[in-house]
């Protein structure tokens, strides 16, 4: 396995997606602009060139602005469902069929896909080792 980077920036995760208000955004499932994001004390959003704040369950991720993005020009907007899913390492072909609010709740409650995969692979490998050891022991 290749060594993992200590972290990934928000831009690394979502930087190749088009602006959700552009015509190109329609080509990406669940990539729809949601208006209303505002900065206020304790609600500041994630910066593109830093790791994303934790995606919290719920539409707005209050408190802390976790489900909000600070753009390069200083403007803020809510993450799209697709952007939130990317941050949680869902594949782009994973389709969320619920409303924006419910989809954001599902993503915020989810274990990141790549983390679940790593844990599952580790558990599987250890169980396999135990099984092999038991078989060797029982054959002696």
Predicted features and spans:
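Flexible, glycine-/basic-rich loop-and-beta segments that form/coincide
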Residues: 1-27
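C-terminal target-recognition/interaction regions appended to catalytic cores
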Residues: 17-140
């Amino acid at each position: 396995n290749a060594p993992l980077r200590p972290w990934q920036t928000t831009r690394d995760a979502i930087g190749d997606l088009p602006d959700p208000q552009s015509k190109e955004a329609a080509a990406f499932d669940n990539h729809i602009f949601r208006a209303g994001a505002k900065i206020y004390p304790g609600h500041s959003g994630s910066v593109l060139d830093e790791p994303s704040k934790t995606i919290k369950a719920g539409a707005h991720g209050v408190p802390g602005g976790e489900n909000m993005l600070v753009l390069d020009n200083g403007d803020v907007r809510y993450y799209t469902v697709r952007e939130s899913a990317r941050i949680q390492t869902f594949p782009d072909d994973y389709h969320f069929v619920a409303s924006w609010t419910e989809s954001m709740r599902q993503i915020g409650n989810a274990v990141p896909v790549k983390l679940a995969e790593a844990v599952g692979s580790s558990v599987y490998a250890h169980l396999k080792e135990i099984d092999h050891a038991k078989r060797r022991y029982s054959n002696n």
